[in-house]
Amino acid sequence: RQLTDDFYATSVNQHETSLDFKVNEWPDEEFTIPMVGEYNVNNALAAIAVGKQLHITPAHIKKALKNVELTENRAEWVNGAQGERILSDVYNSNPTAAKQVLKTIEELPTTGKRIAVLGDMLELGDASARLHASLAANIDPKKIEEVYLVGTEMENLQDALEKQGY
């Protein structure tokens, strides 16, 4: 059977450190992944679709997804010295991932301030300045109160944020 876009997630619920969702193919099953960012549901759906094609049961797929080992510093929660909760997504970042993480930060509930610390994204070639500056459109000062930038390429984002009055 050929997979189509008829395979999709429903009832997506984001928590502080995980996501729960259902899949239309198995509406009574709830899947959990130990990471934030609704974009990660699409990654999980790819794994679920492959599992389904290989006739792996939903129970086994659920267990594997719930226990997946994350790459260090990719959507990883870190505890700060004074009790801060830091979402670290600094390993080999790229514009698409950075935009998704900024969206996730804006959507996560918090009792404190949201602070973004962004460093240079490497290996972007001639498009580097434009791609760094493009992140400004994904930073809402009403939702992310402070932004700290590290690296020479991030000067492009700084210029773009200043033009927006940030």
Per-range role (PLM):
Residues 1-2, 151-155:
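Short, polar loop motifs at secondary-structure junctions
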Residues 60, 156-157:
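Phosphate- and divalent-cation-binding pockets in alpha/beta enzyme and binding domains
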Residues 15-17, 25-144:
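Nucleotide phosphate-binding/pyrophosphate-handling subdomain across enzymes
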Residues 146-149:
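A short beta-strand/loop micro-motif in the catalytic core of glycosyltransferases
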Residues 157-166:
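Short acidic, glycine/proline-enriched helix-loop-strand junctions
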